């Protein structure tokens, strides 16, 4: 804003003193207009000479002054020099206003569109003529160079003879048509005349007569057709260099006669000119061969040097006028470089196509497009880098929050709404084949199933460790994690079936269809599905399970302790085994009698329970017990044999010995309670949140599985004998015969349906005691099984108790008793069956492990071998 105010002030001041500016003195005008001053000589570039008043010229200068004032600072530096009026339009020019400039040497009036230029003025009055005396005829006495190129002149300037010091005259690029006799008369100091690119068609032969110092005449690109005047000029001035290219020469036969008169050198020149005229027929065309020759119109070298150079060139033959002119131009350029730099030349003054200054000015323009692209790319990279640097911490923070919010076991969690809650069942689960749990979901087996679908038995030690760690919790080195305890509590609180959550090895059912299906089956639906299935197909599987349970229960010490040899054996055989497949045989005794009664009612021929009891004797019951003990005795040798081979033998033997009368006689519909009987009440689930002793009375009979049998009194006596033998040994080891003996002790007499309700009340305490001692896990893969009984009087061995292997397709043998059936109910979680009621009541009992063999199995290895051979 401050600069703006200053400029306004200067503008107002200049307008106020317009009078002063319009009438400057001579001295001030001369000092304002000079462009350069060198060695005391004043060099003035007067381009405002016109036939107008001095006031108009002064106003033009004042306008230029104010225009420079209001331009930006960057443009002011360009206009520090005096104005260059090379492009102003001037119609007529005279040198009278410049007559007082005695020191003027160079006058450049190019590109002014001048139509007329004259130095001849009418004589002043006599008084004025007397005042100036002899100086009246002398105008611009020191002017040496006059440049009038690129104008509209139709003829040579008039009165050139008055310029006594003129050495170079440039009239190129005009419209000159004719050169007369007196055009250059009296210019005795003239050395070079440039008439290039005009329309000259005729030249007077004596036009250059008397110009003894004339060295260069450029007549290129004109309309000349004949060489007669040129030859005349050349003869008069033998040292003269002529530029005759690009003319319309007519090389006819008449010129041949003229060539015979001239010398050989002129003949060669004539031939060269004729050849060039044939190639270039356009009269006004320019060539680049003598483009540099125009630089020679300002010469500072002495005339003697130029004469010697021209004479040496003139002696050569037709080496051509163009060659002489180009060489002369090079020499003159070196000597005249200082003089040429004394005044600025506009790029328009040299209008030919090869102007170097115009080319250099174009090259100086900055590449705006390339610069913009480079800047945009650089800015893009910088912005991207800044965004990445600032956004990286926020991205890392969001990723950490996402990882922290994600639960570690969410990927391996196994959730099923059929169970009670989400169970992380697949945390360490290794699927080696088709799981036994999966087979019970699709258990629609028939008698003609392939016997190769055999369940491989598991080593016996894993069930013992799982039960001890899952229910006892007294081992300080094997404490349950909070997640496992929570899953155990949730599984016990309802009737849901819990998959093992620890490292479990599953039974692989080879070739069983629909083995990969995972479905949620409720306990009621599971119970009904078992009634629709053929129970003959799973006897071999129950053999392996019972054998494994009995073997582990025999070596399990009280309060969860067991020998180190068994611990090592458990580690060698298998790292982990399922806890919910151990008690499948114990559940086979509940459904059979009920289904028998249902089948009788459906067929219309009900069989009384008394008749069923009459078919069974006490001897047969003992045979069943002895058969189980024999299987427990044969466990060591049974484990050494291939699982598939042993089960195939058992399958074939049982399949061929099954009597047709023992096959199921009920339909395939859902389970329906007989009309003559009352529905049996379900036991309540066991609640592990309370103490075992305090919860003893309030615990439901969920895990107590009742079966219908007529041999309750005899089985009660065998149970009392086995408990007495265990107490005499001073241990609190649980009886392993709960799967057969205890459940048969708790069986009510089925003489009538009304006796079932009355008999359940006194048997509830015994069932709860057995439930606390020996409740086994029953998963969703529990199935209806029947026991294979044989005649053997040996008692159950506490050490050799194991789970009986289950074989699909197995049928009831003729040794089995009709009344001994097991009913397996889905139970929540395994309750520690290693304790008896006496252990809970008297905690000070000795907890030393029981001897590996009981008194009933001290007969020796021969008897056991005999029993094994008898069984197989």
Swiss-Prot record:
Q: How does it sit in the membrane?
A: Multi-pass membrane protein
Any single Pfam family the record assigns to this protein: LRR_8
Which residue ranges contain the repeat LRR? 142-164, 165-186, 189-210, 213-234, 239-259
Q: Name one GO cellular component term.
A: membrane
| Covalent S-S links between cysteines | none
Going by the UniProt annotation, this protein carries glycans at 45, 108, 472
Q: Which residue ranges traverse the bilayer?
A: 4-24, 371-391
User: Where located?
Assistant: Membrane
User: What is the official name of this protein in its record?
Assistant: Leucine-rich repeat-containing protein 66
Record organism: Mus musculus (Mouse)
- Give the gene name: Lrrc66
